Amino acid sequence: MKRAHPEYSSSDSELDETIEVEKESADENGNLSSALGSMSPTTSSQILARKRRRGIIEKRRRDRINNSLSELRRLVPSAFEKQGSAKLEKAEILQMTVDHLKMLHTAGGKGYFDAHALAMDYRSLGFRECLAEVARYLSIIEGLDASDPLRVRLVSHLNNYASQREAASGAHAGLGHIPWGTVFGHHPHIAHPLLLPQNGHGNAGTTASPTEPHHQGRLGSAHPEAPALRAPPSGSLGPVLPVVTSASKLSPPLLSSVASLSAFPFSFGSFHLLSPNALSPSAPTQAANLGKPYRPWGTEIGAF
C-alpha cells in the first residue's frame, strides 16, 4: 500500500512567511546572533539594509513633525506668548492652533489673509514683552521695588497705552488698513515738521502745505518753552532743528538717517530736543553730568 505524500497548501506557505517575519522582528529586538545564524550572508545584509532605511525614514518623519510644531508655536499668537514662560507640549500647541483657527473662522474668515491684523496682533504681543522687560529692568538694574512711585507710574502708563492701542486696533479692524501715520497723529506721506528740509537763505523752494499751521499749533502747545521749535510766520520753516544750524554740517550717512526718520511712527512730542549749548564742549554742566546715568524717562514721568 503506497503512502500518500502530504500536499503543501497555501496555509503552509503563509506559515513560512510568518516565521520569516518573526525572525526579522527578533532581529530588530536585538537577538541578532540567533536570527542570523541560520541565514545566508545575503539575506542578513538585506535585513540590515532594510532596518537601516526604516530608521532613516522614521527619523525624517519625526523631524518633519517637530519642525511643523515649532512653526505652529511661532505662528499662533497664544502659543508665541506662552513659550517664554514654560515648555509647551505637542498636544498644547495643537490645541492652541485649533482654537486660533476657530477664532479666525468665527471672525468671518477675513483673518486668514489679513496681514495687517496679524501684524497688529504681533505688535501687541511684542509691546507686552517689552513692558515685562521694563519691569524687570526697573526691579533688577535700578533697584526699584513694586511700591516705588516712579515704577508704578511708568508701568501703569505703559499698561494704559497698550490697552488703548489694543482697543483702537479692535475698533478699526473692520475699516481696512490703517496707515501708521494716522495712528500717531500725522499723515505718512507728509514729513514731520521737525524733519522737513530747510533753506539757509530764507526762501522755500516749494509751497507750504495746508497742514503746516496745524502742526505748528501743535508744536507750540506741546513745547511753549522752546522758541526754536516755532516756525516763522513767513511761510518757510527756517531752522527748525536746533541741534544743527545748517545741513552742510551733517555727514551723508547722518543725513540719510535723519531723512529716514520721517516715517518713524512715534510722536516727537515726548522727546526733548537738545539745544546747541547742550552739545558744546564748553558747557559748564557737562562735567557735572558725566557721572549721572542717562535716564530720559525719569524726567518725562511727570507728564504721565
Curated annotation (Swiss-Prot):
Region (Transcriptional repression and interaction with NCOR1 and SIN3A): 48-117
UniProt key word Transcription regulation: yes
GO BP terms: angiogenesis; aortic valve morphogenesis; arterial endothelial cell differentiation; atrioventricular valve formation; cardiac conduction system development; cardiac epithelial to mesenchymal transition; cardiac septum morphogenesis; cardiac ventricle morphogenesis
Cellular component, GO annotation: chromatin; cytoplasm; nucleoplasm; nucleus
Any single Pfam family the record assigns to this protein: Hairy_orange
Limits of the bHLH domain: 49-104
Subunit architecture: Self-associates. Interacts with HES1 and HEYL. Interacts with HDAC1, NCOR1 and SIN3A. Interacts with GATA4 and GATA6. Interacts with CCDC89/BOIP.
Protein name: Hairy/enhancer-of-split related with YRPW motif protein 1
Gene: HEY1
